[in-house]
C-alpha cells in the first residue's frame, strides 16, 4: 500500500496574518486566532489549520501573496490542484530595465519592505564588483547589473518601482481593490492596522488628525489591516480584481467570490464565456476556410 505523507509549513517570516488563505480554503480549515502581542495590547493574529478538515489540496500554498505556506507530499513540493489545472496561480509581473538602471544605485534593494531584492553587479569579465565607486567611468559603463527578486514571496506592492529611477522597474499588482476608512468610527491614535500592515507606506497615521490614512499606490489588499482592526466597520476592504493564470475551475469561482464578491465572480465567468465563444467562432471560420 502506497502511503502519502503530507506536510504543511508556515513560514512566520513571510506570514503577515492576513485573510487570503482563510477565505480561499474550500474546506474552511484555516482560521485566524487572536492573541495579545505585547504590553501595548496590539493584536497579533495567528493562523491555525484544522487538519481534520484539510484535504491538502494546496490552494493555500498557491494563493498566498507572500508565499508563506508550503505544501509538500512525500518530501516534494506537489500541489494537486496545479497538476490538474483546477486552480490558478497569482501572476507576479515584474520587469527590469538594466540599461536604465544607474550603476551606483541600490535604492530598490533598500526600499523593499520584505527584503526580497538583491542586486549583483559584474564587470566585463563577469567578476562581482565589490565597490563600484573605486572604478573609473569607463569601467562603470561596462558593468552589468542583475536584479534578483524572490518572486514567490513578492506581493507586488510597487514600492521598489517608485523608489527607483523612472523606467527601471515596472510592477503590475496582482490584486486590485479599495480600502475605505470610516473616520467617525476609527479611534483616534489607534495603530492596530498600521502595525499589522506588511507594507510600511501603505497605511499610516496622520500627524495632524491622528487618524489612519491609506496610500492605495502601495496597498496589496491582503486584508491584514482588516483582520487587526478592533472596531467593526471602521475599515472596509473591497478586492475588485485578481490577476491569475488561466483556469476553468469551479473551485476558483467559489474562492473568487469569497475573496472579492459574487458580482466579480459572475463578471469573470461571463468574460471567460465570451472569450470561449470567440475562440469557437474563430476555429469554425478557420475550419471553413480550410475546407474551401
Language-model segment annotations:
Residues 1-6, 13, 40-292:
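Flanking helices and flexible, charged tails adjoining ferredoxin-like Fe-S electron-transfer domains
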Residues 4-7, 13-36:
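The feature marks the first
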Amino acid at each position: 500500500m502506497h502511503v502519502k505523507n503530507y506536510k504543511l509549513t508556515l513560514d512566520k517570516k513571510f506570514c503577515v496574518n492576513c485573510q487570503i488563505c482563510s477565505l480561499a480554503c474550500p474546506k474552511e480549515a484555516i482560521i485566524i486566532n487572536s492573541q495579545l502581542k505585547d504590553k501595548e495590547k496590539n493584536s497579533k493574529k495567528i493562523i491555525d489549520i484544522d487538519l481534520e478538515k484539510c484535504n491538502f489540496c494546496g490552494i493555500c500554498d498557491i494563493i498566498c501573496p507572500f508565499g508563506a505556506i508550503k505544501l509538500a507530499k512525500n518530501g516534494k513540493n506537489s500541489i494537486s490542484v496545479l497538476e490538474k489545472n483546477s486552480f490558478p496561480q497569482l501572476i507576479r509581473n515584474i520587469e527590469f530595465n538594466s540599461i536604465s538602471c544607474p550603476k551606483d544605485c541600490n535604492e530598490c534593494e533598500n526600499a523593499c519592505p520584505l527584503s526580497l531584492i538583491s542586486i549583483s553587479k559584474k564587470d566585463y569579465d563577469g567578476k562581482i564588483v565589490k565597490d563600484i565607486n573605486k572604478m573609473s567611468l569607463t569601467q562603470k559603463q561596462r558593468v552589468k547589473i542583475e536584479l534578483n527578486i524572490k518572486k514567490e514571496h513578492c506581493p507586488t506592492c510597487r514600492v521598489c518601482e517608485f523608489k527607483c529611477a523612472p523606467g527601471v522597474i515596472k510592477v503590475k499588482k496582482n490584486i486590485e481593490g479599495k480600502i475605505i476608512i470610516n473616520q467617525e468610527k476609527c479611534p483616534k491614535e489607534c495603530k492596530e492596522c498600521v502595525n499589522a500592515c506588511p507594507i510600511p507606506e501603505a497605511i499610516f497615521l496622520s500627524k495632524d488628525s491622528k487618524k489612519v490614512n491609506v496610500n492605495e499606490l502601495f496597498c496589496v489588499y491582503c486584508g491584514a489591516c482588516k483582520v487587526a482592526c478592533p472596531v467593526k466597520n471602521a475599515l472596509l476592504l473591497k478586492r475588485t480584481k485578481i490577476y491569475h493564470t488561466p483556469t476553468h475551475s469551479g473551485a476558483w469561482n467559489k474562492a473568487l467570490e469569497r475573496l472579492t464578491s459574487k458580482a466579480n465572480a459572475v463578471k469573470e465567468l461571463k468574460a471567460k464565456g465570451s472569450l470561449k465563444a470567440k475562440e469557437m467562432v474563430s476555429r469554425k471560420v478557420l475550419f471553413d476556410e480550410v475546407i474551401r
